[in-house]
A protein has these predicted regions:
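Active-/binding-site microenvironments in catalytic and ligand-binding cores
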Residues: 1-124
């Protein structure tokens, strides 16, 4: 989960169009790919810059896609990016269990409902 600061609640209703909102570098996305991160949740409108001429470098790096027309064998099609999330300050940084509820659309994008659960420290 990437939560940007300041974490104002107004993020939930901001119109990001034509604002050149922050985004991830291709290198940052590649690092996450190489680190084995499967599900990226971010509170920005996109991991890529708003006007990138369709390059989508951060998306492609995260999914390890070299050519969208002919997918490479090692493309990470089981991974997801969820953009425009809001994580309230009450959710502290740390490890959580993620229930990522994804609509079963046959499309390259789908709405999702990520739910975080605290990991209980219990002794057996």
């Amino acid at each position: 989960i990437i939560r940007t600061l300041p974490n104002f609640k107004i993020k939930k209703s901001l119109n990001y169009s034509n604002t050149n909102a922050p985004y991830l570098s291709e290198e940052a996305s590649r690092f996450m790919c190489e680190s084995g991160i499967q599900h990226l949740l971010i509170d920005l409108p996109s991991v890529d810059k708003e006007k990138d001429k369709g390059e989508l470098l951060a998306h492609k790096a995260f999914w390890n896609v070299t050519d969208v027309n002919t997918l490479n064998d090692d493309a990470r099609l089981d991974c997801t990016i969820t953009e425009m999330i809001f994580v309230p300050d009450e959710v502290k940084d740390g490890s959580y269990l993620l229930n990522l509820q994804i609509a079963s659309f046959d499309n390259d994008a789908s709405p999702s409902k990520p739910v975080l659960y605290a990991i209980l420290n219990t002794k057996i």
